[in-house]
Amino acid sequence: MNGSFTVKKVLNNNVLIASHHKYSEVVLIGKGIGFGKKQDDVIEDKGYDKMFILKDEKEQKQFKKLLDYVDEKLVDISNDVIYHISNRTNHSLNEHIHIALTDHIAFAIKRQQQGFDMKNPFLMETQSLYPEEYQIAKEVIDMINEKAGLCLPEGEIGFIALHIHSALTNRPLSEVNQHSQLMAQLVEVIEDSFQMKVNKESVNYLRLIRHIRFTIERIKKEEPTKEPEKLMLLLKNEYPLCYNTAWKLIKILQQTLKKPVHEAEAVYLTLHLYRLTNKIS
C-alpha cells in the first residue's frame, strides 16, 4: 500500500483508527502505535504491524464499543490469533472476525476465570464438518492458553472453529451454527431409527457427515441432482429402513432450509446409512 494515514481516533496504545485516501477508514495495529498520538497526526506507510478495514459503519461502532470493555492484552492476543488464522488458511478473512472472535475470546476467558465451564453439545459434529478449521482452532486455543496463562475447555475449540469457518466463507455465524445444530438433530434421528449409538469416530460416520454437509450446500444453491430411478427402486425394496430414514432426514432438511430437495438425495443418503449401520468400509 502506498501513502500515509491520518489518525482519526486512538483506541488504545496499540490500536487506532485512521483515514486513508484509498481505503477510507482503517484500523491500524502495532506495538505502541497509539501512544502519544493525537487526531490528525500522520503515520507513514509500514509504520504499523497489521491493518484491517471495517467498511460497514455499524461494524466500526461495534469495534469501538468492544474496546471499551476488552483490555489491551486481550486485544493483542486476539490480533495475534487472527493473524495466525489468516496465515494458516492462506485465505482472506471476513473482517467481522475482528469483532466476533475478540468478543468470544473475551467472554470465554471471563467464564474460565469465574469457574464456569460452558459445554459444547455440537463438538463432534463441528470436528466432522470442518476438520481443517477445527485443527486451526486447536492451535488458537493453545496460543490463548499460553499467552493468557489459562486452560480453556475443549468445547471452545468447536466454537472457535465455527468463527473461523464463518470468516472464511463470508457466512453469518448464526447460519454456521444452524448447520451444526441441524447435523446433531439428523444424527439423533438416525440413532432413534436404528436403535443404535453411532460411533462418531468411524470412517463411515465421517463420510455421512461430510455428505450431508455438501447436500446442505447443494440444497441451498438449488443445484440439480441426477436421479438414478432403478437404483432408487432397488434400495427402497432391499433396504426399507435405510430408505425411510433417508426420507425422514430429507423432510427435516426441507423444513429447516425451506428449500426443495431432489428425490435423488434419498438414494445417496440411503447408501451412506446402509454403510454406517452395517459397518461396511
UniProtKB/Swiss-Prot annotation:
<comment type="similarity">
    <text>Belongs to the transcriptional antiterminator BglG family. GlcT subfamily.</text>
</comment>
<dbReference type="InterPro" id="IPR036634">
    <property type="entry name" value="PRD_sf"/>
</dbReference>
<dbReference type="InterPro" id="IPR004341">
    <property type="entry name" value="CAT_RNA-bd_dom"/>
</dbReference>
<keyword id="KW-0804">Transcription</keyword>
<keyword id="KW-0597">Phosphoprotein</keyword>
<dbReference type="GO" id="GO:0045893">
    <property type="term" value="P:positive regulation of DNA-templated transcription"/>
</dbReference>
<dbReference type="InterPro" id="IPR001550">
    <property type="entry name" value="Transcrpt_antitermin_CS"/>
</dbReference>
<feature type="modified residue" description="Phosphohistidine; by EII-Glc">
    <location>
        <position position="163"/>
    </location>
</feature>
<feature type="domain" description="PRD 1">
    <location>
        <begin position="69"/>
        <end position="174"/>
    </location>
</feature>
<keyword id="KW-0805">Transcription regulation</keyword>
<keyword id="KW-0010">Activator</keyword>
<feature type="region of interest" description="RNA binding">
    <location>
        <begin position="1"/>
        <end position="60"/>
    </location>
</feature>
<feature type="domain" description="PRD 2">
    <location>
        <begin position="175"/>
        <end position="278"/>
    </location>
</feature>
<keyword id="KW-0677">Repeat</keyword>
<comment type="subunit">
    <text>Homodimer. The monomeric form probably also exists but it would be inactive in RNA binding and antitermination.</text>
</comment>
<feature type="modified residue" description="Phosphohistidine; by HPr">
    <location>
        <position position="211"/>
    </location>
</feature>
<feature type="modified residue" description="Phosphohistidine; by EII-Glc">
    <location>
        <position position="104"/>
    </location>
</feature>
<dbReference type="InterPro" id="IPR036650">
    <property type="entry name" value="CAT_RNA-bd_dom_sf"/>
</dbReference>
<comment type="function">
    <text>Mediates the positive regulation of the glucose PTS operon (ptsGHI) by functioning as an antiterminator factor of transcription via its interaction with the RNA-antiterminator (RAT) sequence located upstream of the ptsG gene. The RNA-binding domain of GlcT directly binds to the RNA antiterminator (RAT) sequence and prevents transcriptional termination. GlcT binding requires two identical and nearly symmetrical triple base pairings in the RAT sequence.</text>
</comment>
<dbReference type="InterPro" id="IPR011608">
    <property type="entry name" value="PRD"/>
</dbReference>
<dbReference type="Pfam" id="PF00874">
    <property type="entry name" value="PRD"/>
</dbReference>
<dbReference type="InterPro" id="IPR050661">
    <property type="entry name" value="BglG_antiterminators"/>
</dbReference>
<dbReference type="GO" id="GO:0003723">
    <property type="term" value="F:RNA binding"/>
</dbReference>
<dbReference type="Pfam" id="PF03123">
    <property type="entry name" value="CAT_RBD"/>
</dbReference>
<protein>
    <recommendedName>
        <fullName>PtsGHI operon antiterminator</fullName>
    </recommendedName>
</protein>
<keyword id="KW-0694">RNA-binding</keyword>
